[in-house]
UniProtKB/Swiss-Prot annotation:
Residues 1-23 are annotated as: Disordered. One of its GO terms (molecular function) is rRNA binding. Keywords: Methylation, Ribonucleoprotein, Ribosomal protein, RNA-binding, rRNA-binding, tRNA-binding. It comes from Leuconostoc citreum (strain KM20). This is Small ribosomal subunit protein uS12. It comes from the Bacteria. Pfam families: Ribosom_S12_S23. CDD domains: Ribosomal_S12 (cd03368). The gene is rpsL.
Length: 137
């Protein structure tokens, strides 16, 4: 416990909060080959690996994920939401922040219905979250 005198000399310092999706906090200038401080809500990338992984206890499933090389040269693991997908290696995808609680190391989501990623077929509810067009009347 510090004394009042110690606190007068050196006040308490508040902790800076760390970003939960750090890859979205940097851009990349390919002309200068330097990172830039462009914070972005989404980033484009190329899938380098598509596969499944198993969640932490007590859950059990095969969750779909893609390893993505972003436009700022970061490589991240992103979750593919929804039932079924058309992604393969070299697919161009758009990612957003947002972790998957039962998959360690997965801090990003792939946006369905954007770039090479198709929307979920036959989805009727929450269509906007899964990139599905309105059904024909």
């Amino acid at each position: 416990m510090p004394t009042i005198n110690q606190l007068v000399r050196k006040p308490r310092k508040s902790n800076a909060t760390k970003s939960k999706s750090p890859a979205l906090n940097f851009g990349y200038n390919s002309m200068k080959k330097k990172a830039t401080n462009n914070v972005a809500p989404q980033k484009r990338g190329v899938a380098t690996r598509v596969g499944t992984m198993t969640p932490k206890k007590p859950n059990s499933a095969l969750r779909k994920y893609a390893r993505v090389r972003l436009s700022n040269l970061y490589e991240v693991t992103a979750y593919i939401p929804g039932i079924g997908h058309n992604l393969q290696e070299h697919s161009v995808v758009l990612i957003r922040g947002g972790r998957v609680k039962d998959l360690p190391g997965v801090r990003y989501h792939i946006i369905r219905g954007a770039l090479d990623t198709a929307g979920v077929d036959g989805r009727m509810t929450s269509r906007s979250k899964y990139g599905t067009k309105a059904p024909k009347k």
